[in-house]
Amino acid sequence: MVHGTRVSVRAAFLACLLACFAMLLLPGSEAELPVEDFTHAVIGEEFTATWCVYCPSAAENLYKVWRPKSEYPDDPYYDDQFFFVALITDVNDKADDRAGDYPDFTGYPTVYFDGGDEKVEGGQSDTSNYEQAIDNCGSRADTDISLRISMQHLGDDRIAVQAYITWNEDGGFGDPTFDGYIRAYIVEPISRYNNYDNEPYHFGFLDYAFDQEVELDSHEEVILETVWVGGDHTDSNGDDFSDISYDNLNIFVSFFNNEQASADDYALQTAFAIPPDVNFWFPTEVLSDTASLTGTASSPRTTIGSVEYKVDDGEWLLAEGTEEFDLQLDTTAYANGDHELLLRISN
């Protein structure tokens, strides 16, 4: 619509949802260590193999610790202070390589917490050993690191990923920087691989978005960016990941100590990117005047902080509401023709 004259603006909007996430610290837990007493979120690396008889019991008890309290009120729960990844070594060479980073790794299942600060071996009849390991790691006094991770679906098997890292301490005169190592695990919550009981793994590892050293200056944010393409990566059988489903992808990222003077390589912080549940109707018919486009959004681990939208290459605009949102789209601001509408949901 131009100068008040009613014309058709066809909104062939691309249903492209950008999900941006940062780690939030939410109170409330029935585990031994209250969530508010955690110094950082804890990562568990579950080393497993599809032929391993005792691995399913380990996986299920890890999952009991992770899954939402609202759905499973009798299970322990750490809100968003604990995440784990299943590193299935007989189907993924990078998972097998990661096992080689631990000199004391001897068999399956083995779960390393925070890069080896705690280790639990063997099948498990309950969650107690995992809870104790998580509590011990979560209470560890350590370097103050802020960490965020974002992911956006670019269509098909292409995922844009950004990591934001800040060292929140003053550097010393002799050592003004901090050396770390970042691993961003791309996982499928419902894995394409089945365990010995013929059930899908929880958070089965596919590949790293980032797997590299990082040098931090005091109080300065470092931003890493990449575009991960599933078809460019394969498992041990030579099968690529071009068939990924964005709704079945999470990214868990951990920043590890890599200082030469340090006696350990423990994880200092962990964050996550999980696509939200979004119900939104992307219009395909002709729009005019000011169009009201509504939807809902929810996240299994945190609350929704904001909903933003933009048209084509314009600026991001804030929608009204969060869990229930309303986009007031002024079609008079755009020329006649097809346009691209993008949503960005942040926790």
Where are the model-predicted features located?
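Short, well-ordered amphipathic alpha-helices
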Residues: S29, L62-R67, T226-V229
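Short, conserved sequence motifs used for protein processing/export or organelle targeting and
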Residues: T39, P76-N279
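Conserved beta-strand and immediately adjacent loop positions that scaffold enzyme active sites
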Residues: I43, T110, Y181-R183, F252, ...
